[in-house]
Regions:
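Bacterial Sec-dependent N-terminal signal peptides
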Residues: 1-12
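Alpha/propeptide regions of enzymes that mature by internal proteolysis
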Residues: 11-128
Length: 128
């Protein structure tokens, strides 16, 4: 029911079109996922502390991104998934494989936060 993807992006990377990879069609106004009607994206980032990392004290650099394929409409969307290299946590893929549907937001976070993000989304989902 819930799809969590580990994020490993360390910096801004060029977009495919920017480096000459061709795609059919035209981009939306912002060339972003939010150009798709009904899609909503939200995020939260925590940055705390500076200097050398001290275990248990920081500094902290973490966050979570939520993608709601149909916005606040909870109707399922057709879905599938693909594992590029098997690294990271992909919670919820069994349901997608069995049903072919995604019924919850797509959450992107670090591996250590997968459990707490899953729990928070399920609490939110029950309330809506």
């Amino acid at each position: 029911m819930l799809l969590l993807i580990q994020s490993s992006v360390l910096g801004q990377k060029p977009r495919a079109r920017d480096i000459g990879i061709p795609f059919n069609g035209t981009t939306g106004k912002f060339n972003a996922i939010t150009d798709v009607k009904g899609v909503e994206v939200g995020y939260s980032t925590i940055i705390s502390g500076q200097g050398k990392n001290v275990r248990g004290k920081g500094p902290v650099r973490t966050g979570v991104t939520a993608i709601l394929p149909r916005g606040k409409n909870n109707n399922p969307v057709f879905a599938n998934w693909y594992s590029l290299n098997g690294n990271g946590e992909m919670t919820g893929t069994t349901w997608i494989t069995e049903s072919g549907f995604l019924e919850t937001p797509i959450m992107i976070t670090n591996t250590n936060s997968v459990g707490v993000v899953r729990d928070a989304v399920l609490k939110w989902f029950v309330k809506t």
